[in-house]
Amino acid sequence: PSIDDFVGNKKNQRQLIFLSNPSNPTGITKKGDTLKELVERSSFKNSGLLIDEAYEIISNPPVSAMSYIKNINNSNLFVCGAATKGLQAPGIRVGWVVASKNNIEILGNFSSFGIGGVSKLSQIYLENLLERGRTDLAHSAIPKFYDRQRLKYADAFNKIGLETFSGSGGFYHWCKLKNNKTAEDLNRALFKSGAAILKGNDCDMKREGDESSLRNFFRFSFGSLDPDSFKDNIEILSKALATINQ
């Protein structure tokens, strides 16, 4: 969606705009002047902007809306992060919000009776994860690692006849099958090798099932794959594609 799509034209009405950036699950990332415009047009007066940046450092280079705000205390910007992706610690189930002091105090009052809080053990664990030396290392190493994986798989997919539609963030590739083959066809072939992909129609908000315009698309996740398994993974996928296209 464009910035105009997000902001709309209801200037005198209160509104809160929600956005994941990089987008989950597409990996499309708003950056540069586009992100700057979004922050400037939607973070002040009657408008608020909540950006989920859980995948921030999966993108190379990392992108944050915080780069475009001069004084967060004079804004309605909310930036969310999580240990799940960037800090590679999904088990502790901890996230955070950066916002103005006033908005954080309001959220803190609500969480005390509405949410319950985070366990002491998770807080201690996260405190160590956020040690500056470790976060500097994560911001350097993680984007490079996933970028290598992203580019390597994209190149291989193009060579075996898949069309890719992927952003620069996240650890997924969106691929389109040729010859009107469906993701359901591909999964049936992959199951024989103990593998699977996520069907595009399972991510269709219109919930059109087999009639979905996304039925020829699938999502391939390289996030949890051992880099050394690359050849085997491409071989399994190539055989499955050959099976459904014969």
Language-model segments: which ranges?
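Helix C-cap/helix->beta junction micro-motif
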Residues: 44-45, 160, 193
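PLP-dependent enzyme catalytic core of the Aspartate aminotransferase-like
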Residues: 73, 192-193, 204-246
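Conserved core segment of the aminotransferase class I/II
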Residues: 70-144, 151, 239-242
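Short beta-strand segments
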Residues: 18-21, 50-53, 81, 172-176, ...
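Active-site phosphate-binding strand-loop segment of PLP-dependent enzymes
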Residues: 1-61
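Conserved glycine-rich beta-strand-loop-beta hairpin in the small C-terminal domain of fold type I
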Residues: 143-154, 163-176, 191, 213
